Each structure stands twice: as C-alpha cells, then as structure tokens.
A protein has these predicted regions:
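Single conserved hydrophobic/aromatic residue that forms the stacking wall/gate
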Residues: 2-4, 8, 12
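Conserved RecA-like P-loop NTPase ATPase core
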Residues: 12, 37, 77
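A short beta-strand-to-loop transition that corresponds to the Sensor-1 phosphate-sensing loop
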Residues: 13-25, 43-46
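A short helix-turn-beta junction within AAA+ P-loop NTPase domains corresponding to the substrate/partner-engaging
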Residues: 26-43
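Conserved AAA+ ATPase small/helical "lid" subdomain
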Residues: 41, 46-137
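Intrinsically disordered, low-complexity regions enriched in Pro/Ser/Thr/Gly and acidic residues
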Residues: 134, 142-146
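Terminal-proximal interaction/regulatory segments of ATP-powered molecular machines
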Residues: 147-357
Length: 357
C-alpha cells in the first residue's frame, strides 16, 4: 500500500522595520530561513485624516487622554508626518499631492494638481516606505504636551518649536533636514496663520457686531447714492459727499476683499437690501444676512492689525468697554477649544506674524 503522509504546515507572521529586515537578510546564516519568507511591504499611512485617527487612539489610551489639545494640533502633526513619507511629484506641489491623497478635490484650487492615480503612478510601488514613523510622531506629541511646565497641553505653535528642535537633534542627512524645514516654513506655518486667523477673526467679530452693522449701513447708503449719482449729506455732521468722495469711501471697504467689479457689486448689494427692507418694516437687514457683503466687511474689519489690538491683546485696556470686549473674545476662544493660556500665546504669536508680513 502506498502511504501518503500529510505534513501540517504553519504560517508565522511577523513585522519588522525596513532597516532591521535588511540587516537580517544580509546575514548569510539566515539564507535557508529567508528562502521560506514571503515579504509583504506595508507602507506608512499616507492619508492625513487616518494618521490623525491613529494619534487620537494613542492619546485615548495614554496618560495624556485628559490633557488639553488645541484645535489643529493633531492635524498639523499628521500633515508633517505624511509629507515626510511622500515622494515629491513633478510639476506639482507635494502639499497638493498630500491633500489629494486625503480625498480633497483641488480642481478649482490648484490647476497643477493631478489625480490620485497619476500621483500613485509617478511615485512607484515603494512610496510610504520611508519618512517619519507614527511612533516618532507620538514622541513629538508627548514633548509638545510637556513643553510648557505650567500647563500640560498641546498647541500648534509649540508643535512647530518642538519639530524644529527635533529636526536639528536627530542629525538627519543635510538634504532631508532642509526638506523638513521647508515643509514647516512653506506649508505648515502659512496654513496655520490662515487657520488661527480665522479662529481669532470669528471670536473677534462677535465682539464687534455693532461695528459690523454700522459699516454695513454706511456701505449701503453710500452705494445707493453713488448709483443714483447724487450727493449725500451726513445727518450727524452735515458733511456733504459728492460721487467721488462716496466712491473713495466705498473703495476703502472693498479694497481688502479685492472686489474686481465694484459697480456690479454695489448694484447687487443695494438691490438685495431694498428687497430685504420690504420684509423688515423698512429697516436694513442684519449685516450677517448677505454673505458676499459680510465677507467684505469682515476683511475690512480684520485688515488692520492695529484695530485688533484693543480686543485681542492682553495689555491693559483703556476703557471698560475694551476690557469687556476682550473678556468676551477670550471666552469665545475658550468655547472653541483653547485654554486661556493658549488664547494669549496664539493671539500674540498671530499678531507678531501679521506685523512681520
């Protein structure tokens, strides 16, 4: 009788970093074992959203789970980590590539952005096998939480400082050091200036709602008289504005928003307000009711750093009204996810950056 003996087969799964694997592979004593190894290369995470989710999970299971983390901190770290893992594309920004990988559609934002498949094809099969690990990133995050000895909390400004320090300390090759610094300077910092600016702007404008309404009412009045080619007499001061003077004042409001066709814009605004008055007992609507003009007014109110100081800065206030507006601003920022100490740090950082620009 022919006896068939069936052997039981076993599969052992293990994971290793690329460097350790090459050390093991280059050892001739392991040749027989290596012949029985099937390699599955698993790249680092290349999607910012998923990288953030990893950090959130790690934080939930750590002693930092109850520590305060300011908005955009994890997002900034995830962006930096992801950028270090991507291959630089040709004729396109690596930052745009990162955003496309994360599922964003940049058709109307960046004409040089390519499709995800095009980026994949250009990068080759080993994209994501190099760059900073999630473990390294979490060590960075831990240092950020402990950057300020008086408050266990993390924020993007401290994250930038820690990243810059670590880049110098790690002694990366010169080319990689320069690349990582470029990521911070060209992508992370400008994007965060925009982000924190919008955060501050929202809290600031809520403290100046009456001021916004005054600008709205004045703009509508001036635009209406300008369209009709009539002089306007200020009822409070008696000052007379001819069409040229009206145009100059309207342009002061429009200029920060870059209105390219003021004639059409003014007609559009006045027509909207006239229709709205019919349903509002003849009164102007809220300055928040018409998004296009609201955007213009917000840019006007936020265009001069000096105008922000009474509300945003933490210096002694010249009046009780300024102090009240400042307190309201701080509380609104706290409600958006910041500690009071972070509000001061980030506001002062933002004002310095704005002043330097």
């Amino acid at each position: 009788h022919l006896s068939i003996r069936r052997q039981r087969q076993m599969c052992i799964r293990d994971s290793s970093n690329e460097a350790e694997w090459h050390t093991f592979k280059n050892n001739k004593n392991n040749e027989a074992f290596i012949d029985r190894v099937y390699i599955v290369k698993v790249p680092y995470c290349l999607r910012v959203t998923e990288e953030m989710q990893i950090y959130e999970k790690l934080l939930r299971n750590s002693s930092l789970r109850d520590a305060h983390c300011a908005p955009d901190t994890l997002h900034m770290l995830a962006q930096f980590s992801t950028l270090t893992r991507l291959k630089e594309p040709e004729n396109s920004s690596i930052y745009s590539k990162m955003r496309v990988y994360d599922g964003e559609n940049l058709k109307d934002v960046d004409p040089h952005a390519k499709s995800m498949q095009e980026y994949h094809d250009m990068a080759g099969v080993d994209e994501g096998m190099n760059g900073l690990s999630t473990r390294f990133a979490f060590k960075i995050l831990s240092k950020v939480f402990n950057y300020d000895h008086s408050e266990v909390a993390a924020n993007p400004v401290h994250l930038i400082h820690v990243l810059e320090q670590r880049i110098d300390q790690e002694q990366f090759p010169q080319e990689r050091q320069e690349q990582y610094r470029r990521f911070i300077k060209e992508y992370l910092v400008p994007r965060y200036v925009e982000f924190i600016g919008k955060e501050i702007q929202t809290a600031y404008l809520e403290s100046y709602s009456e001021y916004g309404q005054n600008i709205f009412d004045r703009y509508v009045t001036y635009a209406d008289f300008w369209i009709q080619d009539q002089e306007f007499r200020d009822p409070d001061t008696g000052e007379i504005f001819d069409r040229q003077a009206l145009n100059e004042d309207l342009e002061k409001i429009e200029k920060p928003a870059g209105i390219s066709n003021p004639k059409d814009f003014r007609n559009e605004v006045v027509n909207f307000v006239l229709r709205a008055r019919a349903n509002n007992h003849g009164k102007n609507p809220s300055w928040l009711s018409y998004q296009k003009l609201r955007d213009v007014i917000e840019k006007k109110m936020f265009s001069n750093t000096e105008d922000l100081l009474p509300v945003i800065s933490f210096n002694a206030k010249g009046s009780e009204d300024d102090q009240r507006k400042h307190n309201n601003f701080v509380q609104r920022m706290v409600s958006r996810g910041y500690t009071e100490k972070q509000v001061r740090l980030l506001s002062e950082w933002y004002l310095r950056v704005r002043k330097a620009q």
